[in-house]
C-alpha cells in the first residue's frame, strides 16, 4: 500500500505544487524513515557500536608553554544509538521532475556516549585511565529521492559535527590544565575519526533498510 501511495503522490508532486500531495508524500517518507530507524535499532550491531582503536600525536599551547604528547584510545564503544528518532517532518521538493526529501534523525532526549580506555604520554606523565565522552547533540543529516515508480533511494547520509561534547576523564578534575588539553584533543578526534566511522557504519545499514522496504 505504501508503494502505491508513493507512486501516486510522487507523480503529482513532480508536476504540481498542490500542498495536499506534498503532505501525503511527506507523510509516507516520514513513515519509511521511521521504519528504517526502527529496523536499525533492533540490530545488536549498532548499540553498542564498536569503533576501531585510535592512536594520535598532538601539540597544544597553554600560555607560553608548548605541550606535545601522544595518546592511544582502546576498546571504544558507542552507546545510545537506539534512542535515534526522526526530527520533524521531511522537507520535500521537486527538482526537474524528481521528488527529493531532506531529513534529520537524532538523539535529543538522551545522550550518545563513547566509553574507552585511554593511555597518554604528556611530558613525564604516562597514565592509563578510563574515559566517558557524552555527545549531547547527536544528529544525522540525510537526503533521498523518490522515483516515478515510488522507489526510494538514499542519496546522502552524514553524522553532523558534534556541537557539544562533555568528557569525563578518570583521575582528572575539570579544573586541571591537563584535562583541558586532553579534552580538546579528544573532541577533535571525535569530530574527525569517530564521526567518520559512525557515518561509515550507519549509512549502509540505513540505506539497506530504507530501500529494502521501498523498492
From Swiss-Prot:
Protein name in the entry: Mite allergen Der p 7
Main location: secreted
First and last residue of the signal peptide: 1-17
Subcellular location: Secreted
Natural source organism: Dermatophagoides pteronyssinus
A Pfam cross-reference name: Grp7_allergen
Domain of life: Eukaryota
Keywords (A to Z) from UniProt: Allergen, Glycoprotein, Secreted, Signal
Family, as annotated: Belongs to the mite group 7 allergen family.
Glycosylation sites: 151
Classification via InterPro entries: Mite_allergen_7_sf, Mite_allergen_group-7
GO cellular component term of the entry, any: extracellular region
Amino acid at each position: 500500500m505504501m508503494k502505491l501511495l508513493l507512486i501516486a503522490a510522487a507523480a503529482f508532486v513532480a508536476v504540481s505544487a498542490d500542498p495536499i500531495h506534498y503532505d501525503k508524500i511527506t507523510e509516507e517518507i516520514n513513515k519509511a524513515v521511521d521504519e528504517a530507524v526502527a529496523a536499525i535499532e533492533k540490530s545488536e550491531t549498532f548499540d553498542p557500536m564498536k569503533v576501531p582503536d585510535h592512536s594520535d600525536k598532538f601539540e597544544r599551547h597553554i600560555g607560553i608553554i608548548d605541550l606535545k604528547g601522544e595518546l592511544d584510545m582502546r576498546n571504544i564503544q558507542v552507546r545510545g544509538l537506539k534512542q535515534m528518532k526522526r526530527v520533524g517532518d521531511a522537507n520535500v521538493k521537486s527538482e526537474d521532475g524528481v521528488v527529493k526529501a531532506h531529513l534529520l534523525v537524532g538523539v535529543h532526549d538522551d545522550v550518545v556516549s563513547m566509553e574507552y580506555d585511554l593511555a597518554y604520554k604528556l611530558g613525564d606523565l604516562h597514565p592509563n585511565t578510563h574515559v566517558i565522552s557524552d555527545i549531547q547533540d547527536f544528529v544525522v543529516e540525510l537526503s533521498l529521492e523518490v522515483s516515478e515508480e515510488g522507489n526510494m533511494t538514499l542519496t546522502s547520509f552524514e553524522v553532523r559535527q558534534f556541537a557539544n561534547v562533555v568528557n569525563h576523564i578518570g583521575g582528572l578534575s575539570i579544573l586541571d590544565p591537563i584535562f583541558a588539553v586532553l579534552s580538546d584533543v579528544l573532541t577533535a578526534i571525535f569530530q574527525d575519526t569517530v564521526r567518520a566511522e559512525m557515518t561509515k557504519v550507519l549509512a549502509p545499514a540505513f540505506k539497506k533498510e530504507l530501500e529494502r522496504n521501498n523498492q
